[in-house]
């Protein structure tokens, strides 16, 4: 079900700055006036994952957000002692259980529009609490797509 919410050009530009230019570590998006997905927060390249979790929850326990993060981790190929750095972009839909039903429905029905606008994201994650959004949970989901 489409919500009719559009994605602002600023979202697309900021995404390209993360994906191609490696200019930022992450961006938090929100739905403005129930009409358009827009940029709320942009973090510089040296920002940590903990800061991302703080920013995605910053508006309060009843608020939903989207977050795009350029995630880095070390990957070890099976049968070798060599490790290599991996980078994957993931897009998170943050809709806590404490959010009102109307807001959760708006964010979940608008997630598709954002996904279609941000081509090249490797993983989509839906989180309703911190256990689903933790660094460990996200890294596990990203590693599941690695080749052994």
UniProtKB/Swiss-Prot annotation:
- Provide the record's note on post-translational modification: Phosphorylated in vitro by protein kinase LIMK1. Phosphorylation is required for inactivation of tsr and for cell proliferation and axon growth. Phosphorylation is negatively regulated by the panthothenate kinase fbl which catalyzes the first step in the conversion of panthothenic acid to coenzyme A. Dephosphorylated by protein phosphatase ssh which activates tsr.
Keyword Nucleus applies: yes
Q: What happens when the gene is disrupted?
A: Late larval or pupal lethality with mutants showing defects in cytokinesis in both mitotic and meiotic cells, abnormal accumulation of F-actin in mature primary spermatocytes, and defective aster migration where the asters remain in close proximity to each other rather than separating from each other and migrating around the periphery of the nuclear envelope as in the wild type. Failure of terminal filament formation in the ovary at the third larval instar at 25 degrees Celsius but formation occurs at 18 degrees Celsius.
Q: Where is this motif: Nuclear localization signal?
A: 19-23
Which segments constitute the ADF-H domain? 4-143
A Pfam family this chain is assigned to: Cofilin_ADF
InterPro entries in the record: ADF-H (IPR002108), ADF-H/Gelsolin-like_dom_sf (IPR029006), ADF/Cofilin (IPR017904)
- Give a GO cellular-component term: actin cytoskeleton
- Could you confirm whether the keyword Cell division appears in this record? yes
| SUPFAM superfamilies reported for this sequence | Actin depolymerizing proteins
Q: Give the UniProt subcellular location, in the record's own words.
A: Cytoplasm, Cytoskeleton; Nucleus matrix
Choose any GO biological process term that the UniProt entry carries and state it: compound eye development
Give the family per the record.
Answer: Belongs to the actin-binding proteins ADF family.
What more the UniProt record tells us is: The name 'twinstar' derives from the characteristic aberrant arrangement of asters seen in mutants.
According to UniProt, the name of this protein is: Cofilin/actin-depolymerizing factor homolog
Q: Which organism is it from?
A: Drosophila melanogaster (Fruit fly)
Gene name, Swiss-Prot/TrEMBL: tsr
